[in-house]
């Protein structure tokens, strides 16, 4: 029993995170030097994301009997994303108004260091809706894979899958090659995941070593407000959706606990993307659904990021005593409904989208970003964790809506009654 516990990735990552926190706290200079370990692990994962998405989407679409099903799945997924992310924005808005973490700070925007956030504000100017849509279309296929742009790779994979499906039996050889290549890719993922404890240790040691516990205490009310909101969203909103779909959110969280710990250690939900693709398929969701919903969700279904954006924007307004009546808050909500959809595939994405939102709203000081620059890293964990759980739930819900969910397999796996690989007939 003890041997199996020590060998489990869950235990190893959890232990690595704890050691990283202790090292960063007691030996901050050494902790900061551990940054390459975390960065290296995330880069290894990002290296494999593009081929994983390509193989999963192509084999999923090309293996379907009807192309109409793909379009239906995409439409249902986008509808679900819009509804749930809007709920996330509204919940964030309600909680931050009730708690008011920025009230009483009385910060003069003129005293803030605008230079500290200038790089984010400059990048935000390029994050318009048209620019976002145009960015989905790659200048070249090789460029899309080289840059690791998820949506660009997804677009090419969907087109490739459609074209391969139209070839029929003539394309069977290509289909078999891609399917075999997919197995090799997942073999590489299994090797990379053995390094997860090292990556989690390095990332956590760096974070605590560089920013320290004092940063947490300084703006602790905002951090606590954000974490509580994320927990409430997962338990109440996603929990209710899960219950209506026929599964327990807590059992699902237990099922993806290793992925959650990896995300906690690296603060990047992308670090768990390859394993989530595999795990959601083993949970009973059709490969074509998983291949469309998970990658698309990384741009259109970022529930944690949506909560962060509303709370951070209103916090800045409260801290700087900027006017924020009901009209301004509705305006903020409308702007965020659009700007939050561009939060993926951009370095410092949440922060950049927040800068773009403050600029678009107009009456909120962009320099106010300096208030949360130091603690943004500590809130990124909750963002990434909530995003991951949200995309997992979305995959199951969409699979059920389009009747591509194996209910028996879902129930068996979540209740530990069957091996992950066992198959059952689909039910509607």
Swiss-Prot record:
SS bonds (residue pairs): none
Q: Which Pfam families match?
A: SDF
Q: Which subcellular locations apply to this protein?
A: Cell inner membrane
Question: What are the BP-aspect GO terms?
Answer: L-aspartate transmembrane transport
Which InterPro entries does this entry report, sorted A to Z?
A: C4_dicarb_transport, Na-dicarboxylate_symporter, Na-dicarboxylate_symporter_CS, Na:dicarbo_symporter_sf
Which terms does the record give in the GO molecular function aspect?
fumarate transmembrane transporter activity; malate:proton symporter activity; succinate transmembrane transporter activity
Membrane-protein topology: Multi-pass membrane protein
The highest taxon in the source lineage is: Bacteria
Q: Which keywords fit this entry according to its UniProt record?
A: Cell inner membrane, Cell membrane, Membrane, Symport, Transmembrane, Transmembrane helix, Transport
* A single Gene Ontology CC term: plasma membrane
Annotated transmembrane regions: 8-28, 44-64, 76-96, 142-162, 184-204, 222-242, 297-317, 326-346, 352-372
Which Gene3D superfamilies does this one have? Sodium:dicarboxylate symporter
Q: Give the similarity note.
A: Belongs to the dicarboxylate/amino acid:cation symporter (DAACS) (TC 2.A.23) family.
PANTHER family in alphabetical order: AEROBIC C4-DICARBOXYLATE TRANSPORT PROTEIN, PROTON/GLUTAMATE-ASPARTATE SYMPORTER
Function noted in UniProt:
Responsible for the transport of dicarboxylates such as succinate, fumarate, and malate from the periplasm across the membrane.
Q: What is this protein called?
A: C4-dicarboxylate transport protein
The scientific name of the source species is Escherichia coli (strain K12 / MC4100 / BW2952)
The UniProt gene name for this protein comes to dctA
């Amino acid at each position: 029993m003890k041997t199996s516990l020590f060998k489990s990735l869950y235990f190893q990552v959890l232990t690595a995170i704890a050691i990283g926190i202790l090292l960063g706290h007691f030996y901050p200079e050494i902790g900061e030097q551990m940054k390459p370990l975390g960065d290296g692990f995330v880069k290894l994962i990002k290296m494999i994301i593009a081929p994983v998405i390509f193989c999963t989407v192509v084999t999923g679409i090309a293996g379907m009997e009807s192309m109409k099903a793909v379009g239906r799945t995409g439409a249902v997924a986008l509808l679900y994303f819009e509804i749930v992310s809007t709920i996330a924005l509204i919940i964030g808005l309600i909680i931050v108004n009730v708690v008011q973490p920025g009230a009483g700070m009385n910060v003069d925007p003129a005293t803030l260091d605008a230079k500290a956030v200038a790089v984010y504000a400059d990048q935000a100017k390029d994050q318009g809706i048209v620019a976002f849509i145009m960015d989905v279309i790659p200048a070249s296929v090789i460029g899309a894979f080289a840059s690791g742009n998820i949506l660009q790779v997804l677009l090419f994979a969907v087109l490739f899958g459609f074209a391969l499906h139209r070839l029929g039996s003539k394309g069977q050889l290509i289909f078999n090659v891609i399917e075999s290549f997919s197995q090799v890719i997942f073999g590489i993922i299994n090797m990379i995941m053995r390094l997860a404890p090292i990556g989690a240790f390095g990332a956590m040691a760096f974070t605590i070593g560089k920013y320290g516990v004092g940063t947490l205490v300084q703006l602790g009310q905002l951090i606590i407000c954000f974490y509580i909101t994320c927990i409430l969203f997962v338990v109440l909103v996603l929990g209710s959706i899960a219950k209506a779909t026929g599964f327990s959110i807590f059992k699902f969280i237990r099922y993806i606990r290793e992925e959650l710990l990896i995300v906690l250690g690296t603060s990047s939900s992308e670090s768990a993307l390859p394993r989530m693709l595999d795990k959601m398929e083993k949970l009973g969701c059709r490969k074509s659904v998983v291949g469309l919903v998970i990658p698309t969700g990384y741009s259109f279904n970022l529930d944690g990021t949506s909560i962060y954006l509303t709370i951070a924007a209103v916090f800045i307004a409260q801290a700087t005593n900027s006017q924020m009546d009901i009209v301004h808050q509705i305006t903020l909500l409308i702007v965020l409904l659009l700007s939050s959809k561009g939060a993926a595939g951009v370095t410092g994405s949440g922060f950049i989208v927040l800068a773009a939102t403050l600029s678009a709203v107009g009456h909120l000081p962009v320099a106010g970003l300096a208030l949360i620059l130091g603690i943004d890293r500590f809130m990124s964990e909750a963002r990434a964790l909530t995003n991951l759980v949200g995309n997992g739930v979305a995959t199951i819900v969409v699979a059920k809506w389009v009747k591509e969910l194996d209910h028996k397999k879902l129930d068996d796996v979540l209740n530990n009654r069957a091996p992950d690989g066992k198959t059952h007939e689909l039910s509607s």
